[in-house]
């Protein structure tokens, strides 16, 4: 869907993935990151080897719109809506669900107008007591984040 807004698929930068170069200052681009806020124990198991934890946090999709484009603000709003709609009312097959999705307009930077799309997420996982096994998600699928076109992997 983003290709219909700006004429190309904007570059997407991911948290924890080093890029060899800075984004092109004349192009729209996005940065996706998460922040885990809580990992609370939500249920005691009758068997002490497993306990349920609920993890919650925030997904951020930061959208950068080049000031050199006369329609940057308009296109930024449209790109933000695509990102918002990718999360609004959605959950993954792995039981990660999203809520309270919103668009925040931020102060501009030197080269870019900026928008933040923020989605709260939540999922459950089972923690094994054995140290070598670590955490085992209730579902095998980890949180899934926004990708182009408002769909999930």
Stretches with model-predicted labels:
Residues 39-42, 66-70, 124-130:
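Short, cysteine-centered beta-strand-loop-beta hairpins and adjacent loop/turn segments enriched
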Residues 46-47, 51, 89:
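Histidine-centered catalytic/metal-coordination loop motif
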Residues 131-153:
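Viral virion structural and adsorption modules
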Residues 78-132:
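Acidic-leaning, charged glycine-interspersed low-complexity segments
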Residues 24-39, 53-55, 98-111:
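Short, charged, surface-exposed interaction patches
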Residues 51-67, 113-125:
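Oligomerization/assembly interface segments of phage tail-like spikes and tubes
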């Amino acid at each position: 869907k983003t290709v219909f807004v700006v004429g190309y698929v904007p570059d997407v930068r991911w948290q924890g993935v080093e890029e060899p170069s800075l984004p092109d200052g004349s192009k729209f681009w996005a940065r996706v990151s998460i922040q885990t806020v809580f990992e609370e124990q939500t249920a005691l198991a009758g068997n002490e080897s497993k306990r349920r934890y609920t993890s919650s946090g925030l997904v951020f999709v930061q959208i950068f719109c080049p000031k050199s484009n006369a329609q940057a603000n308009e296109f930024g709003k449209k790109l933000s809506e695509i990102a918002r709609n990718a999360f609004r009312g959605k959950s993954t097959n792995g039981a990660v669900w999203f809520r309270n999705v919103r668009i925040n307009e931020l102060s501009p930077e030197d080269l870019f107008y900026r928008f933040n799309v923020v989605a709260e997420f939540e999922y459950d996982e089972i923690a094994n007591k054995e140290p070598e096994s670590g955490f085992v998600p209730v579902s095998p699928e980890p949180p899934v984040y926004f990708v182009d076109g408002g769909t999930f992997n």
